[in-house]
């Protein structure tokens, strides 16, 4: 059952990411900011030619290689541990979805569409795929910590 559900969830997460980016591009002009939840979240449309926090601008070949490697390793690990803990499955599904969501942008557009601006903190503008990656990495750390505390060293 997991072999069916996980790919479906992955496709749905990628679709949500891509639809959010398409909506932003259609409804908000480049570099425009629109208040969404006052003093908490604004929406904007930025083109990110780099990585997180706009580092390594215009290094698309590097991001392509890194994404192929990370997503490939995550898929292989997921297939080998399909009966693993829910923390592990959730984390890998989110990492794969986030990586592929931004990868699609880079292949299709040559940049990643970013749109979420947190008004209450000075933080980088990000997108839904970035959120998947961040939450996925946190869940992976929890999964590995739980495995370690249970004496499971796979």
Swiss-Prot record:
Pfam families assigned to the protein according to its UniProt record, in alphabetical order: Peptidase_A8 (PF01252)
Alphabetical keyword list: Aspartyl protease, Cell membrane, Hydrolase, Membrane, Protease, Transmembrane, Transmembrane helix
Active site: 114, 130
The EC number(s) this enzyme carries: 3.4.23.36
Coiled-coil region(s): none
Membrane spanning residue stretches: 4-24, 62-82, 84-104, 125-145
Catalytic activity annotation: Release of signal peptides from bacterial membrane prolipoproteins. Hydrolyzes -Xaa-Yaa-Zaa-|-(S,diacylglyceryl)Cys-, in which Xaa is hydrophobic (preferably Leu), and Yaa (Ala or Ser) and Zaa (Gly or Ala) have small, neutral side chains
Topological category with respect to the lipid bilayer: Multi-pass membrane protein
Enzyme type, top EC level: hydrolase
GO molecular-function term, one example from the UniProt record: aspartic-type endopeptidase activity
Gene Ontology BP, a term: proteolysis
GO cellular component: plasma membrane
Subcellular location: Cell membrane
Known pathway: Protein modification; lipoprotein biosynthesis (signal peptide cleavage)
HAMAP family: LspA
Job of this protein: This protein specifically catalyzes the removal of signal peptides from prolipoproteins.
Family label: Belongs to the peptidase A8 family.
Annotated protein name in UniProt: Lipoprotein signal peptidase
Organism annotation: Streptococcus agalactiae serotype V (strain ATCC BAA-611 / 2603 V/R)
């Amino acid at each position: 059952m997991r072999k069916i559900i996980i790919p479906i969830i992955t496709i749905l997460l990628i679709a949500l990411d891509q639809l959010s980016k398409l909506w932003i591009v259609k409804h908000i002009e480049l570099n425009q900011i629109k208040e969404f939840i006052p003093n908490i979240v604004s929406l904007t449309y930025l083109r990110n030619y780099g990585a997180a926090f706009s580092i390594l601008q215009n290094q698309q070949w590097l991001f392509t290689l890194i994404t192929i490697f990370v997503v490939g390793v995550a898929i292989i690990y997921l297939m080998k541990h399909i009966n693993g803990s829910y923390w592990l499955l959730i984390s890998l599904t989110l990492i794969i979805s986030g990586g592929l969501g931004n990868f699609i942008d880079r292949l299709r557009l040559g940049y990643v569409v970013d749109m979420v601006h947190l008004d209450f903190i000075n933080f980088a503008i990000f997108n839904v795929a970035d959120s998947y990656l961040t939450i996925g990495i946190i869940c992976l750390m929890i999964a590995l910590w739980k495995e370690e505390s249970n004496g499971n060293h796979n």
